[in-house]
């Protein structure tokens, strides 16, 4: 069962992690109407740097081709829009690592492992803790599915901001791996670690 099917089966369309009344980060499922906005985001310089590079700047048609199948639940990637006080501030996605294809996680054997990626749309909001809140919200949402055993991610070794963000959200470095995008820092959060953190929070 995909995360998206699991969410819709239970009627889950949004998850929020509330830190105070003026700083609530929420996640909602992305829709087809968000594709033009995502296209504009993916062409912003601070995102291009870590999301494909200058040579991979997408056209609107590229974004529609790549992301519409996820929106329509035709593949195992689940796309979200992150919201702050009712305004869209970023994109996140989760996917089943096993069988993800294109050279990704080919040695994975656990169907309960999920991969995640995310971005903040506005450069002015970097370094203010919003990325950590977004990741925490996504992690808790995914672990609401009892079938999920571990969440993993793979920031570039040069993306120190992302690495710090993941560490603050409870991820641990497990070394460097080679991915289709090049070297990456392999970072994980297990269900056991997540539940242990919640018990002592």
Curated annotation (Swiss-Prot):
Catalysed transformations (reactions): kanamycin B + acetyl-CoA = N(6')-acetylkanamycin B + CoA + H(+)
Record GO biological process: response to antibiotic
A GO molecular function term, named singly, is: aminoglycoside 6'-N-acetyltransferase activity
Q: Which Pfam families match?
A: Acetyltransf_8
Identify the InterPro entries for this entry. Answer: Acyl_CoA_acyltransferase, GNAT_dom, N6_acetyl_AAC6
Domain N-acetyltransferase intervals: 25-192
Tell me which residues bind substrate: 51, 154
Q: Where does acetyl-CoA bind?
A: 159
Q: What is its EC number?
A: 2.3.1.82
Question: Which top-level group of life is the source organism from?
Answer: Bacteria
Its keywords, alphabetically, are: Acyltransferase, Antibiotic resistance, Plasmid, Transferase
Task: Briefly state the protein's biological role.
Answer: Catalyzes the transfer of an acetyl group from acetyl-CoA to the 6'-amino group of aminoglycoside molecules conferring resistance to antibiotics containing the purpurosamine ring including amikacin and kanamycin.
How does this polypeptide assemble, per the annotation?
Homodimer.
- Could you identify this protein by its name? Aminoglycoside N(6')-acetyltransferase type 1
High-level lineage: Bacteria, Pseudomonadati, Pseudomonadota, Gammaproteobacteria, Enterobacterales
């Amino acid at each position: 069962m995909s995360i998206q099917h699991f969410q819709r089966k239970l009627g889950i369309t949004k998850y929020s992690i509330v830190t105070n009344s003026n700083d609530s980060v929420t996640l909602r499922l992305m829709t087809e109407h968000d594709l033009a906005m995502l296209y504009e985001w993916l062409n912003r310089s601070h995102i291009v740097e870590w999301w494909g590079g200058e040579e991979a700047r997408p056209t609107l048609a590229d974004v529609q081709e790549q992301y519409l199948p996820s929106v329509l639940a035709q593949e195992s990637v689940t796309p979200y829009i992150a919201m702050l006080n009712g305004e869209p501030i970023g994109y996140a996605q989760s996917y089943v690592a096993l069988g993800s294809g294109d050279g990704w996680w080919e040695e994975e054997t656990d169907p309960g492992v999920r991969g995640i990626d995310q971005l903040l749309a506005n450069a002015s909001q970097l370094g203010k803790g919003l990325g950590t809140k977004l990741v925490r919200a996504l992690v808790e949402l995914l672990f609401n599915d009892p079938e999920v055993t571990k969440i993993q991610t793979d920031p570039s070794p040069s993306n120190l901001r992302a690495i710090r963000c993941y560490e603050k959200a409870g991820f641990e470095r497990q070394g460097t791996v080679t991915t289709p995008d090049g070297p990456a820092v392999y970072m994980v959060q297990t269900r056991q670690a997540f539940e242990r953190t919640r018990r002592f929070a």
